[in-house]
Amino acid sequence: MTFFNDKTDGKEDWITPKSIIESLGEFDLDPCCSMTQPYLIGKINYNKNDNGLEKEWIGRVFLNPPYGNKTGLWLKKLSNHRNGIALIFARTETKMFFDYVWNSADSILFLKGRVTFLQPCGNLGKFTAGAPSCLIAYGEENTKYLKNSNLKGKFIKLCNNNYTIMEK
């Protein structure tokens, strides 16, 4: 789910493209599954009615949180869980990014170009996202998935405030 730009036709559910999911391996949990998800991402999937933010998270998580003023709460939960990948806007200057990415994540893949999310029916959206996106990895296993994925962009390994940038 997401609230990500002014070109959404008033819709709040936007689905991660399957090509992104397939390049990142299998996930145990998707805590932000759309009510009409055309394909499931996790072995367990919580939708809006389940309130995935309040549920217990287990295993490897894929998080495409609702975008807006509560995105930080979702990232905080994933940061504390320490096992998963989040897809968010690359808003590197925000408090949320400093608190739960720069100071907590293990790696980042800044995606080349802008993501075209899917509508809940499975069709591509009419527009690309309103900002660049990145994938945030928590845990070494998830860092390996990001690094070895076929997704184009810039991969950055974060460790003790030392950064290694790798062309992808």
Residues of each region from the PLM?
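Class I S-adenosyl-L-methionine-dependent methyltransferase catalytic core
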Residues: M1-K168
